[in-house]
């Protein structure tokens, strides 16, 4: 929803009810991206490749070969790519299941025309769960107390709520029932005994992207689900068992079970060896101007960089408020006209400086690639992760949620 329409809706709600509307998450856009004119006027933006996304979906579906259902994880506004941008591709490629985190994400998924299976992949607050009933969404349950509370909410609305019971098989210790203890097993049995909850799936989530660790967690999950199915007298044919995230889906095929939950792989975020998956996002900015400074000058806050020669520095219209973090100070590189140039001085809130002394063709208005490809050059996932000290998702979810997004190709 464009800002002006969001503001109008909020104003009308305030006038009519005397209260501001409540959102479980910020309103997300249903538009097919920011138009090109808006991007040209933005200090930084994200480009999302529809062709790369569709290629990745087809590649993954071919790898699953119909043996496991694909559930596309679109939490964090589709990992920063924009649910409103990616849902047409999800629907076009026949993906049967979508997973989200917030009610606002669920709203956009349903508003896009998706009528398939919709699952929340984290525990909801009770108010979220109640509000989420309108989206026909399956909920995660990981404790007997929460199950009783969810049951009461469903009963109050005259509904039966479909649930996925989360088990702590891999030691994530976040959402799941601890089936390694007898008290935990008793709790799991209580969850299956709620009148207004229908158990449709058993799931776990792997804590480490390591094949041996995944297999250990999978073995525990298999034992625990076998026990629960037997002692709760569940019909296995009516249950979906799922555990695999993107890493486990691609690297440990036996973990795929009935369904896989893939997010990163859909957008090209995989282990380096999986080159068949294409990156769906690029992060870009502009050169504002190029300045000349003499040798000996310092650059930026705290004088962390001193020019060793007379230099030409390009002023880039992006900073840490846009998700280009200060950790890239004196370490990062960007692409301008295909030239790989270094970040010099501290990254500021809205500005960074790069050294373009060796490239006289660089001028104000040039496009800058902060992450992605340009004219044969590339700012890679590996280098960004090494400097940032974290998974790339720690960066690109922020880029996508802090800057305008546009759908390309």
Swiss-Prot record:
Modification sites for N6-(pyridoxal phosphate)lysine: 75
Location of the active site: 75 (proton acceptor), 301 (proton acceptor)
InterPro entries: Ala_racemase, Ala_racemase/Decarboxylase_C, Ala_racemase_C, Ala_racemase_N, Ala_racemase_pyridoxalP-BS, PLP-binding_barrel, Racemase_Bsr/Lyr
One Pfam assignment: Ala_racemase_N
Catalyzed chemical reaction(s): an L-alpha-amino acid = a D-alpha-amino acid; L-lysine = D-lysine; L-arginine = D-arginine; L-glutamine = D-glutamine
Record: residues binding substrate: 174, 349
Names of the cofactor(s): pyridoxal 5'-phosphate
Cysteine disulfide links: 71-97
Location within or outside the cell: Periplasm
EC number: 5.1.1.10
Top-level division of the source organism's lineage: Bacteria
Signal peptide per UniProt: 1-24
Protein name: Broad specificity amino-acid racemase
Species annotation: Pseudomonas putida (strain ATCC 47054 / DSM 6125 / CFBP 8728 / NCIMB 11950 / KT2440)
GO cellular component annotations of the record: cytosol; periplasmic space
An example molecular function term from Gene Ontology annotations: lysine racemase activity
Keywords: Disulfide bond, Isomerase, Periplasm, Pyridoxal phosphate, Signal
Family: Belongs to the alanine racemase family. Bsr subfamily.
Enzyme class, spelled out: isomerase
Residue runs in coiled coils: none
Knockout-associated phenotype: Cells lacking this gene exhibit a limited capacity for catabolism of L-Lys and L-Arg as the sole source of carbon and nitrogen. They don't secrete D-Lys in the growth medium. The stationary phase peptidoglycan structure does not differ between wild-type and the deletion mutant strains, indicating that products resulting from this enzyme activity are not incorporated into peptidoglycan under these conditions.
């Amino acid at each position: 929803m464009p800002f002006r329409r969001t503001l109008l809706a909020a104003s009308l709600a305030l006038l009519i009810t005397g209260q501001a509307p409540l959102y479980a998450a910020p309103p997300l856009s249903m538009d097919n991206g920011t138009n090109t004119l808006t991007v040209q006027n933005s200090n930084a933006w994200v480009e999302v490749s529809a062709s790369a996304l569709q290629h990745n979906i087809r590649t993954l579906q071919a790898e699953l070969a119909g043996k496991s259902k694909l559930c596309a994880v679109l939490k964090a506004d589709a990992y920063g790519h924009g649910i409103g941008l990616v849902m047409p591709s999800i629907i076009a490629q026949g993906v049967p299941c979508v997973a989200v985190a917030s009610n606002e994400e669920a709203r956009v998924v349903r508003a896009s025309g998706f009528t398939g299976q919709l699952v929340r992949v984290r525990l909801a607050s009770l108010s979220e769960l109640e509000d989420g009933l309108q989206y026909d969404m399956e909920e995660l349950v990981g404790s007997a107390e929460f199950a009783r509370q969810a049951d009461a909410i469903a009963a109050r609305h005259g509904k039966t709520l479909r649930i996925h019971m989360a088990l702590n098989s891999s030691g994530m210790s976040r959402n799941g029932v601890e089936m390694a203890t007898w008290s935990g097993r008793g709790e799991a049995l209580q969850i299956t005994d709620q009148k207004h909850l229908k158990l449709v799936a058993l799931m776990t989530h792997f804590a480490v992207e390591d094949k041996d660790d995944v297999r250990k967690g999978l073995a525990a999950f298999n034992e625990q689900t076998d026990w629960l199915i037997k002692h709760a007298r569940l019909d296995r044919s009516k249950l979906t068992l799922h555990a695999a995230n993107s890493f486990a889906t691609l690297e440990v095929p036996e973990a795929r079970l009935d369904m896989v939950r893939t997010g990163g792989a859909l957008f090209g975020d995989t282990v380096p060896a999986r080159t068949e998956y294409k990156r769906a996002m690029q992060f870009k900015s502009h050169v504002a101007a190029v300045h000349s400074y003499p040798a000996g000058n310092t650059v930026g806050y705290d004088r962390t960089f001193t020019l060793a020669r007379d230099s030409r520095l390009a002023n880039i219209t992006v900073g840490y408020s846009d998700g280009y973090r200060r950790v890239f100070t004196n370490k990062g590189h960007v692409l301008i006209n295909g030239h790989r140039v270094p970040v010099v001085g501290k990254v500021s809130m809205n500005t960074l400086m790069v050294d373009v002394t060796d490239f006289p063709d660089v001028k104000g208005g040039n496009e800058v690639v902060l992450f992605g490809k340009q004219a044969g050059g590339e700012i890679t996932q590996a280098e960004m992760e090494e400097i940032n000290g974290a998974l790339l998702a720690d960066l690109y979810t922020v880029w996508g949620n802090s800057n305008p997004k546009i759908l390309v190709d």
